[in-house]
């Protein structure tokens, strides 16, 4: 349990999946097994949504510390710093291609939502 939104944001910032995305994946999974009998147990990876492109991640902060964050969230840069969030921290994007293929999973919660939530931080 987190005492406030900013504590939760610091945890999410490191790489996490929002409960809404987990719930969506569970519903999609139940739908899948109700439609077909699987020959094997699936192990599927969930991840957050990202505004960053693969090219952004491959060339993270090529223009200086925090530059990739500023490219997408410049209006939140000072806010992020004020709450101890590191805009230079490169996210670890997990491979969810099998999850997308099997379930049609599309995560919706990203840093953009985290930073723009009403009353956030």
Residue ranges and their predicted role:
Residues 23-90, 94-96:
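Mid/C-terminal beta-alpha module of Rossmann-like enzyme folds, strongest
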Residues 9-10, 63-68, 113:
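Short, low-complexity, polar/charged sequence segments that are solvent-exposed and flexible
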Residues 1-31:
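Substrate-positioning beta->alpha
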Residues 89-91, 96-102, 106-121:
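Amphipathic terminal alpha-helices
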